[in-house]
Amino acid sequence: MNGELSFKYDNVMEENLGNLGISNGKLESFNNESSKIIEILKEKELNGEFGFLDVLNDNLDKYYELNEYSKNFENILIIGIGGSNLGLRAAETGILGSFTSRYEIPRIYYMDNSDPEKTHDILSNIDLEKTLVFVISKSGNTVETLANFFIVRNLMKKKNIDLEKHVVSITSGGELEKITKKENYIHFEVPENVGGRFSVLSSVGIAPLSCTSVDIKKLIDGAKSIEKSCKCEDIFKNPALMNAVIHKLMYNRGKTVSVMMPYIERLRSFGMWYGQLWAESLGKNGFGQTPVIAVGATSQHSQLQLYMDGPNDKIATFLKVNKYRNDLKIEYEYDHHLSGHNLSEVITSELVGTENSMKHNNIPNVKITLSKLNEITMGKLFLMYEMQTAISGELYGINAFDQPAVEYGKKIAHECLTGSKVDSENKYINGKYIITSK
């Protein structure tokens, strides 16, 4: 199969974890409650609250036109942060591979943070005359995005680069929308009912991806192919519902940390996207699990000791791929047990070891297996987790689509940038308890 996703949850069950596990009867008892939750979600969808599902029916022709236009460029520069970056990056690296392992054109660069050294390094290594710039911010006022874009825009103007032909704006308001209209950039809107962390399959992700070799129709088709099962009222046929319920039950039992651990580097960025989705959607009113991103087998040599012998406050999710795009055989002329095996066998055996040692230590874990990593399976994975998060919001009784707690920090940052430097330092920066080494 080229597009299969399976969800295994044996290692959260009572028969494997004893009293720390979940009984089948407990899951069956959730069927009545889950049917009510699915009905609520369907009603919200009808009311236009689930834009992340609506975008699956968008006409893709505008993106195919952009694909043709993008062939005039050698580089793609993505300026965006948070939901305007993480999902897109997860899709691109998940499907195509990491930048260092690809040499196809266009080359893709991500400018997210307002770190001056990172921005400088990118601009020192990219030819802006051969670059199509995507600037992405739903609000149009994201500080980090505007700051980086203003710097890039100024450099392009100094080089007499036609901004109208080199800039693609993806926004629905604010300063970015103003300058988009004033300078006539190529423009895509972000639907009002699609939040940043749920926007990977909207224009935020699909427009830039259309300029690469990603088959955007297959990506959307992958999401559509799992949509029906993720709306099923039967918990035993719905992977999103089952995983949401499992995580909520484990949260009730003190599992306040959610470890996402793919055993393939190409899904490292998916883990980062999950980190935002899970934390920002559910971390409210004193609730929420802290997402921790690990990568097998690397993190076995850094974090696993804590998982096995530290506080038993974690539930782990393993991501496995059955068929790697490339594999290498280990050849060694001396007697050694590794000789003759493929690297895929090594990393798979390490996953088996970690999965079963966690079970042995009564640490709950689930596993998602993809037949291979491509547009279809990435589409399935994205939509499953978006639905799982929406369902979890209902289980916790919270709004999974806002993020009120981050606004205060933005307000202070704005005050620091617009007010007196001395006043800002005295009010927010200078401390009383400081240890300094000179």
UniProtKB/Swiss-Prot annotation:
Keyword Repressor (UniProt): no
Organism domain of life: Archaea
Pathway the protein contributes to: Carbohydrate biosynthesis; gluconeogenesis; Carbohydrate degradation; glycolysis; D-glyceraldehyde 3-phosphate and glycerone phosphate from D-glucose: step 2/4
Reactions this protein catalyses: alpha-D-glucose 6-phosphate = beta-D-fructose 6-phosphate
SUPFAM superfamilies in the record: SIS domain
Keyword terms: Cytoplasm, Gluconeogenesis, Glycolysis, Isomerase
Compartment(s) where it occurs, according to its Swiss-Prot or TrEMBL record: Cytoplasm
Any one annotated GO CC term: cytosol
Gene Ontology biological process: gluconeogenesis; glucose 6-phosphate metabolic process; glycolytic process
GO molecular function, one term: monosaccharide binding
Top class in the EC scheme: isomerase
Residues of the active site: 280 (proton donor), 301, 410
CDD domains linked: SIS_PGI_1, SIS_PGI_2
EC code(s) of this entry: 5.3.1.9
Task of the protein: Catalyzes the reversible isomerization of glucose-6-phosphate to fructose-6-phosphate.
Protein name from the UniProt record: Probable glucose-6-phosphate isomerase
Organism: Methanococcus maripaludis (strain DSM 14266 / JCM 13030 / NBRC 101832 / S2 / LL)
